[in-house]
Regions:
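Intrinsically disordered, low-complexity terminal regions
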Residues: 1-290
């Protein structure tokens, strides 16, 4: 009872904080860091443990308002730089804001995750439901997630491995790698980087991979049913297996369409100043590593 009253008001903690407090189903964790590192891992306890390293004049605050448990820090002169190591229940949704700079790592979550940072990498293993990861000047990496996935960067690469669900990935100046993916809806775009997709092509699925100044590589299962549209201005198209462009399939000099199987899936591959390559599953990544 005493902790609940203190938590609502805000709890001031001293240098090198180490505290544990109970949480309940239905609550979510919200972490804000002005600069430093945020590492969140899962455990089976119905509690959150916060270990933080910070300056002697900085204060870490833990507060509860409604269903949100908030962790932040401040000092006498404004925001504080803190390094966090946090243990939280796997079921607990997580939101992290790192402004202007924070490196964020989350592992073992079985809940929704939202991360946004300006200058710092974002690395997540796990996650269920809505997954939204953003970094302006850092790489974004996601492994083993299931759900609705949105990944964004401006000056960094995006890597997605062993994930399933709808996927949207966009960056300006970076590569996009989508490996071992199970999805019926993929939209990946970059301006100055290549795109690699190795995953399922499901019947009635939608797949759009576009780059302005980079190569686009996609794996195509042997029994895929897809209508494939290819567009490249100054690059080339190459397939590791025979494809036939039917009469009328080439609409312009730089754009054509062909069909595999029943053609129920829609696959759009575009690169203005790069090449487009299509191979069987596993071949694309092996060739790119050589």
């Amino acid at each position: 009872m005493l902790f609940a009253l203190v938590a609502v008001a805000g709890m001031m903690l001293n240098q090198d904080t180490d505290t544990t407090f109970a949480v309940r189903q239905g609550q979510r964790l919200d972490v804000s860091d002005f600069g430093g590192t945020v590492v969140i891992k899962s455990w089976r306890q119905s509690s959150v443990r916060v270990r933080a390293t910070h300056g002697s004049r900085d204060y870490v605050t833990v507060s509860t308002e409604g269903a949100t448990v908030s962790i932040g820090a401040s000092s006498r002169h404004g925001p504080a730089m803190v390094d966090y190591e946090i243990l939280a229940p796997a079921w607990m949704p997580i939101s992290v804001s790192g402004t202007p700079s924070a490196e964020v790592t989350i592992e073992g979550s079985e809940a929704e995750i939202a991360v946004e940072t300006v200058e710092g990498a974002v690395t997540v293993v796990g996650g269920r439901g809505n997954i939204e990861l953003k970094s302006v000047e850092g790489d974004v990496s996601l492994t083993g997630a299931k759900g609705h996935i949105e990944l964004n960067s401006v000056d960094g690469s995006i890597t997605v491995k062993d994930c399933s669900g709808d996927i949207t990935a966009a960056t300006v100046d970076g590569e996009i790698s989508l490996l071992n993916i199970e999805s019926s809806d993929v939209d990946a775009s970059t301006v100055d980087g290549g795109i690699e997709y190795d995953g399922t092509i499901t019947d009635s699925g939608r797949y759009r991979l576009t780059s302005h100044d980079g190569d686009v590589s996609v794996s195509m299962p042997e029994r895929a049913n897809a209508t494939i549209s290819v567009a490249t201005f100054s690059g080339s198209f190459d397939a590791c297996f025979p494809v036939t462009i039917p009469p009328g399939g080439r609409t312009t000099k730089h754009r054509f369409t062909f069909t595999l199987g029943t053609g129920s899936a829609r696959v759009e591959l575009e690169s203005f100043d790069g090449s487009i390559k299509m191979c069987r599953p596993g071949q694309i990544h092996e060739q790119n590593e050589e």
